[in-house]
Design a protein with these regions (language model features):
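A generic structural motif
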Residues: 15, 24-26, 42
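Short "repeat-start/strand-capping" segments in structured domains, especially the N-termini
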Residues: 23-27, 83-84
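Active-site-proximal segments of catalytic enzyme domains
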Residues: 28, 34, 50
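Glycine-rich hexapeptide-repeat left-handed beta-helix
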Residues: 39-42, 47-118
């Protein structure tokens, strides 16, 4: 039951209510409060290096989250791949998931290494 493998280098910020399932996590992973990383039909996400999951966001099922990407507040990724260096965010008016290229890795601010070369 307690066999989730976490990366060597990660940061949990205000971790209350956060559930981290048996996904594959890359290093320099950042996760905030109220987040869920979980399975759908026994398939878990694969999360790259330097990924950030902000407050109340979720990644569920067979998803590949590319290096340096951010899952924005209250955004759910369900069995969807996110390219490296992109921000996934939900348009609260339409409920549509939007993907935007990111010039700066959000996780970079928390670690004293250049995540662009990891």
């Amino acid at each position: 039951m307690y066999d989730t493998e976490l990366p060597e280098i990660f940061l949990i910020i205000h971790g209350t209510g956060t559930m981290m399932g048996k996904a594959k996590y890359g290093n320099y992973f950042v996760i905030y409060q109220g987040c869920t990383i979980g399975a759908s039909h026994g398939k878990y996400p694969v999360i790259g290096n330097g990924v950030s999951v902000t407050a109340n966001a979720s990644i569920i099922g067979k998803s590949n989250i590319g290096d340096g990407s951010t899952i924005s507040t209250r955004t759910t990724i369900f069995q969807k791949d996110i390219k490296a260096n992109h921000t996934a965010l939900i348009d609260f008016e339409t409920g549509i998931l939007k993907l935007k290229p990111s010039k700066i890795c959000y996780a970079q601010q928390f670690f004293n290494v250049d995540l662009n070369i990891i």
